[in-house]
């Protein structure tokens, strides 16, 4: 058998095969380049006696992309001209004839994603959509399973949350606090940044008469933006929330923000002040009309903003991976007359279907990435993140809704939520406001603040590292 030696040759001396029928997209060249950057040039280019490439055209292009001047080559000089022509075809086609054990492949991808490594699983060449489909195949479930949206009766939900509490729910976090306070959001993210946003802020529309009708399901008004704000005030409210979403998410991330048709103007104004681009506006079409006198509203709007200028993720790629997506989303609403709908509506007045959020998450994020929601509501974004292998970071102002999110998570995941920090966010904010007021009035040191210390632990409550976390927050506050 002929012994071959690797030669290191300048790229300029390598000649492409005249009739190379194999094509390489720019995307694939970038993937090969990333593999070479990470693992090295492990597969030498095969050339003939005249430096014509028999195998490795994509690797040579990737090497040029990386700015390399040379590449390792193996010279094959025993073939006839006809053999070479056949080999060039065979080298490309035979690899395509192989298959996959999809269960083993999914397990390997899943374990790679869970390992502590400094590279993304897409370095394997599998797309975000392919990884999602394979791993979801390990534990198949029906899309749009009604059980995903089933919410427990409000009367069955225990009262646990207080303002400022930070909870861990498996890989997810929930904080009870003001989404407009950047310190609350900083506590929630803990130096990480979100890969995408799906959030449903209050619509500045009174719940009574617009969401709650005259039936047995009645709702109190939201804690803020429930119809009491002027146009300017609501625009400022949205702009403050958007500023936090932008600050705590990755450059290039897509932010899905739900809104009623009445406040399109405020959304566009606040969005233009914070986002680089409005990528699209999505219409969620429900299967039944809701409240309304001059036409019953059967849709809601979802604005798809882009944060920053970096390229955004797009996993569906015009249906390339079997997911045909448009800007009209058709999912059933909670006012549909089916079993379980009243329970959902009783938990929260504007529940979004989990299946809809699942699809949005899969469109623009990777498994393991963070999904940020600063208006947690009933917790649908958290359930959707869990189903798709993402990590939710959820903020909700109202302790009652926080209690319902906890209860919903524990029922769905059959896991217990853990309180990991108690009341620090809101108490720190109050303390800082008090300090600022004293400094502004010139009476610092003369007036005693009235900010209360953290309340005594509730029965059965564990407050880990309370002193150290308080010091950490004081230090961060400056």
What would you call each of these model-derived segments?
Residues 1-3, 434-478:
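Polybasic, lysine-enriched low-complexity intrinsically disordered terminal tails
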Residues 2-402, 459-464, 472, 477-478:
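Core catalytic lobe of class I
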Residues 163-186, 406-451:
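S-adenosyl-L-methionine
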């Amino acid at each position: 058998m002929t012994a071959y030696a690797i030669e290191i040759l300048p790229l300029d001396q390598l000649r492409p095969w005249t009739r190379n029928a194999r094509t390489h997209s720019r995307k694939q060249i970038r993937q090969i380049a990333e593999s070479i950057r990470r693992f090295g040039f492990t597969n030498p280019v095969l050339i003939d006696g005249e430096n014509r490439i028999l195998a490795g055209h994509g690797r040579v292009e990737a090497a040029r992309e990386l700015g390399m001047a040379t590449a390792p080559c193996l010279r094959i000089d025993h073939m006839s001209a006809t053999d070479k022509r056949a080999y060039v075809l065979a080298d490309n086609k035979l690899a395509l004839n192989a298959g996959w054990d999809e269960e083993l492949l999914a397990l390997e991808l899943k374990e790679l994603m869970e390992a502590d490594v400094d590279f993304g699983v897409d370095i394997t060449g599998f797309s975000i959509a392919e990884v999602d489909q394979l791993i979801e195949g390990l534990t198949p479930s029906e899309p749009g399973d009604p059980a995903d949206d089933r919410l427990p009766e409000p009367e069955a939900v225990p009262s646990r949350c207080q303002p400022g509490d930070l909870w861990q729910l498996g890989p997810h976090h929930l904080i009870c606090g003001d989404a407009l306070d950047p310190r609350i959001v900083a506590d929630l993210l803990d130096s990480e940044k979100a890969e995408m946003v799906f959030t449903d802020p209050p619509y500045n529309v009174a719940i009574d008469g617009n969401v709650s009708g005259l039936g047995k399901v009645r709702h109190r008004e939201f804690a803020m933006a429930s119809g009491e704000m002027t146009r300017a005030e609501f625009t400022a409210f949205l702009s403050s929330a958007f500023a936090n979403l932008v600050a705590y998410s990755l450059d290039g991330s897509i932010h899905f923000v739900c809104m009623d048709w009445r406040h399109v103007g405020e959304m566009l104004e606040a969005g233009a002040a914070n986002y680089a681009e409005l990528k699209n506006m999505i219409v969620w079409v429900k299967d039944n009309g809701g409240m309304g006198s001059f036409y019953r509203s059967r849709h809601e709007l979802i604005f798809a903003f882009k944060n920053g200028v970096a390229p955004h993720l797009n996993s569906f790629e015009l249906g390339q991976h079997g997911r045909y997506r448009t800007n009209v989303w058709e999912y059933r609403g909670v006012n549909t007359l089916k079993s379980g709908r009243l329970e959902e509506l009783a938990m929260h007045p504007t529940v979004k279907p989990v299946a809809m959020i699942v699809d949005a998450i899969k469109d623009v994020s990777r498994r393991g990435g963070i999904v940020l929601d600063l208006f947690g509501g009933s917790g649908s974004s958290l359930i959707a993140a869990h189903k798709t292998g993402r990590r939710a970071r959820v903020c909700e102002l109202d302790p009652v809704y926080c209690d319902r999110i906890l209860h919903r998570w524990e029922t769905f995941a059959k896991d217990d939520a853990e309180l990991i920090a108690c009341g620090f966010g809101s108490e720190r904010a109050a303390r800082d406001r008090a300090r600022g007021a004293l400094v502004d009035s010139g009476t610092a040191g003369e007036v005693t603040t009235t900010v209360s210390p953290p309340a005594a632990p509730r029965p059965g409550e564990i407050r880990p590292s309370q002193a150290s976390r308080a010091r950490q927050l004081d230090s961060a506050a400056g």
